[in-house]
Amino acid sequence: MAKKSMIVKAAREPKFKVRGYTRCQICGRPHSVIRDFGICRVCFRKMANEGLIPGVRKSSW
């Protein structure tokens, strides 16, 4: 779980546009965020396994 202070800091508009970064909407994790869904890989995997993301299924070949 991300620190509350960092989540609040990331929510503010940065002074320069390039300083902005994505955070997971669920847990606040700053790394490995899947932009299409707005969540990190950990939350994505958990939600996909629970069937909460429509159209996503585990691949097998």
Curated annotation (Swiss-Prot):
Record keywords, A-Z: Metal-binding, Ribonucleoprotein, Ribosomal protein, RNA-binding, rRNA-binding, Zinc
Gene Ontology CC entries for this record: cytoplasm; small ribosomal subunit
Gene3D superfamilies cross-referenced by the UniProt entry: 30s Ribosomal Protein S14, Chain N (4.10.830.10)
Cofactor dependency: Zn(2+)
Molecular function per GO: rRNA binding; structural constituent of ribosome; zinc ion binding
Cofactor annotation remark: Binds 1 zinc ion per subunit.
Binding residues annotated for Zn(2+), in chain numbering: C24, C27, C40, C43
Entry's transmembrane regions: none
GO terms for biological process, alphabetical: translation
Matches recorded under Pfam families: Ribosomal_S14 (PF00253)
SUPFAM superfamilies per UniProt: Glucocorticoid receptor-like (DNA-binding domain)
Keyword Ribonucleoprotein part of the UniProt annotation: yes
Subunit organization: Part of the 30S ribosomal subunit. Contacts proteins S3 and S10.
Cited function: Binds 16S rRNA, required for the assembly of 30S particles and may also be responsible for determining the conformation of the 16S rRNA at the A site.
PANTHER family: 30S RIBOSOMAL PROTEIN S14, SMALL RIBOSOMAL SUBUNIT PROTEIN US14M
Recorded family membership: Belongs to the universal ribosomal protein uS14 family. Zinc-binding uS14 subfamily.
Name the UniProt record assigns to this protein: Small ribosomal subunit protein uS14
